[in-house]
Amino acid sequence: MEAEELIGSSVTIDSIMSKMRDIKNKINEDCTDELSLSKICADHTETVNQIMRVGNTPENWLNFLLKLEKNSSPLNDDLLNKLIGRYSQAIEVLPPDKYGQNESFARIQVRLAELKAIQEPDDARDYFQMARENCKKFAFVHVSFAQFELSQGNLKKSEQLLHKAVETGAVPLQMLETAMRNLHLQKKQLLPEEDKKSVSASTVLSAQEPFSSSLGNVQNRSISCESRGQAGAARVLYGENLPPQDAEVRHQNPFKQTHAAKRSCPFGRVPVNLLNSPDFYVKTDSSAVTQLTTRLALSSVPLPYVTCLLHLQLLALAGLAKGSGPDRDAILPGSRPRGSDSYELRGLKPIQTIYLKDSLVSNEKSSELMSDLIALKSKTDSSLTKLEETKPEIAERRPMQWQSTRKPECVFQNPAAFAPLRHVPDVTPKADKESPPISVPKWLDPKSACETPSSSSLDDYMKCFKTPVVKNDFPPACPSSTPYSQLARLQQQQQQGLSTPLQSLQISGSSSINECISVNGRIYSILKQIGSGGSSKVFQVLNEKKQINAIKYVNLEDADSQTIESYRNEIAFLNKLQQHSDKIIRLYDYEITEQYIYMVMECGNIDLNSWLKKKKSINPWERKSYWKNMLEAVHIIHQHGIVHSDLKPANFVIVDGMLKLIDFGIANQMQPDTTSIVKDSQVGTVNYMAPEAIRDMSSSRENSKIRTKVSPRSDVWSLGCILYYMTYGRTPFQHIINQVSKLHAIINPAHEIEFPEISEKDLRDVLKCCLVRNPKERISIPELLTHPYVQIQPHPGSQMARGATDEMKYVLGQLVGLNSPNSILKTAKTLYERYNCGEGQDSSSSKTFDKKRERK
């Protein structure tokens, strides 16, 4: 008897060792694949081409970009530009209307905005806004945007973004609540480390994507068949139908990396843990598995075999499953499953009733369970290729009593965490303020969608897995007063219900002639969109006289009182100043309501910022001409008591070869008896901001706000930075990447500003006079207008030019008094012969001719 037991034990040990060797060989093969992948990834161009060939998915792009960023540490200017270029390339090839519901695509957009914030914070706001519009259902997109605004000192804007995220139903809600709480506590980080850990699990599970990407991870994502199978099983487990593309399993993926280290690293502002991270499984306690098992027990729907396998693996990880026995058979009936089999889980018992006397599983049973799992996995992988999309119909359930005395708890605290990512709501624009309708899957009760879960009954418990209604945050469509009012198309969309938020927001470069804007009864046809920023958009339009104008549209529904006041100031300043100078952009018409503002303005060819980016080298005469235009425009606003305080290249536009000033959004009007004004907050662009606008000059606080002084000399500093950019190709402090270090360098007198030698000595002198930190010692606009650099320098040939001009006047004077063609021809021949012989002008004859003209 003992001999038989020894023989049986030896056979079991041999079997275990054999399986361990197989696993070891499998790991070695995967490591070899990873090394090959690393060699391939050394050539980024080849990697990008490979991504395009295998499907061009956001998951592959994010996997590549994270690895590229990890290898780019520490970050410098060249690497930063390279990263921004790669992220921009990814966004260009990934259409937002197709991947707007994809988490990996959202993280790519957010990370690009964060990198732009490092390089140029002014441009970063547009990228954050783009990410918010394209991927509004993800909470981390809104939190990242709010964190950026908070870092720029825009507390109200940050709070407004978080409130709007809650209204639109962004998930997970817990992340937004945490960010809102920290914002009210005046913390610098909206998601501290301890809060990031608490929301990481819910963030990953709410996505329910096979390639759950993390903003806080810089490791490669596993996109193997195993991960796709488990993620698909999780979605079936919670009542979601598998799309056909997820039911199919790729036989080979060149980006497979199944054994890479999974750890949470600070990447961006909202790091979370992956679903396949070891830390996640460590945190999976028995209570979560208990509730999951209880839910399976109450289900009357036949679930595929892969769902049962996933549940069995969860039990094994929690240490709750036995190697064999009736309880295990209740969980996974049958010993030889097939890929097409499904099982009734009606008789599954809650986990509390399973025999759990021992907290730890014995070594023999653990090895047996592991061998069964390996066998089941191999069969499941083969069966997944035949798996088809199932459409389970949930029968009406009557309330059931829990078999345990313990009150049921929701596995996840956020009721919106299980919103299926692949469900896109159908939003139809309406003129009223009602929320748009949403198409709900058959297994959902539309009336109970988005309700708060309760533990009173099973129905209340299941409500935590309902799909939340996404609220429309776009302006109501009005056929007579919206830039997106395509009258015929809009009526058709309202009838068919095919409009989406993205479709109602985006305007193509070559738009239809049906797109029009009505301003004070005048109709303007939209040609294209030429700019956007924040809540405003600029369109190139054609007026009724077939003249090209620009219309600036501002959405006021989400704007606070300070923003609305800034736009009203802009209109008032334009009306006031355009009468005194042609260097100010012209305002032809405007319309103001509580919902929007329309401004019909002069249309420029290109703004100065875009022009500088396109020009490799600037002609000295162009630079001098544009510099004089800027001085004249700023001099006019200073004469009318206005300090712009946010001058930058984007505030100037080129119109028919002349530079004109635009955008007075944050300008302030000074009183006649003052030389400076006190602002309630720091505004302006860091690269062009004067030191006195950064430093607390007043040493006083009002309503807990730091007040700073700005004066006309502050605009001189900004103009000097623009001229520095036009001369050297960068701003004086652009090479300093860290924003805090940049601010210190601007206000620190010990930090010397570099002025490399150039051929134009007067230009270098102007730069030195403008970039003086002490505003009292800084040059003024009138002094700059009289500076030798602005004046046209006389050339040696100027006297010769004046002589040629006099000769031309003489010739024209001889011809202008003649009437008959014969006289004109005779005089012309005489003049030609005289100049051809070198005789030149006869002054006496010229004077005589002038006297004859006077007598006539």
Curated annotation (Swiss-Prot):
PTM field: Autophosphorylated.
Regulation: Inhibited by the ATP-competitive kinase inhibitor, SP600125.
Residues carrying Phosphoserine: 36, 277, 342, 383, 435, 454, 820
Residues that bear N-acetylmethionine: 1
Name of protein: Dual specificity protein kinase TTK
Species of the source: Mus musculus
SUPFAM superfamilies cross-referenced by the UniProt entry: Protein kinase-like (PK-like), TPR-like
Upper lineage: Eukaryota, Metazoa, Chordata, Craniata, Vertebrata
Source taxon at top rank: Eukaryota
Residue span, Protein kinase domain: 524-790
GO CC term (a single one): cytoplasm
Active site location: 646
Entry keyword annotation includes Secreted: no
Purpose: Involved in mitotic spindle assembly checkpoint signaling, a process that delays anaphase until chromosomes are bioriented on the spindle, and in the repair of incorrect mitotic kinetochore-spindle microtubule attachments. Phosphorylates MAD1L1 to promote the mitotic spindle assembly checkpoint. Phosphorylates CDCA8/Borealin leading to enhanced AURKB activity at the kinetochore. Phosphorylates SKA3 at 'Ser-34' leading to dissociation of the SKA complex from microtubules and destabilization of microtubule-kinetochore attachments. Phosphorylates KNL1, KNTC1 and autophosphorylates.
Enzyme class, spelled out: transferase
Oligomeric form and interacting partners: Interacts with TPR; the interactions occurs in a microtubule-independent manner. Interacts with MAD1L1 and MAD2L1.
Chain positions with Phosphothreonine modification: 32, 380
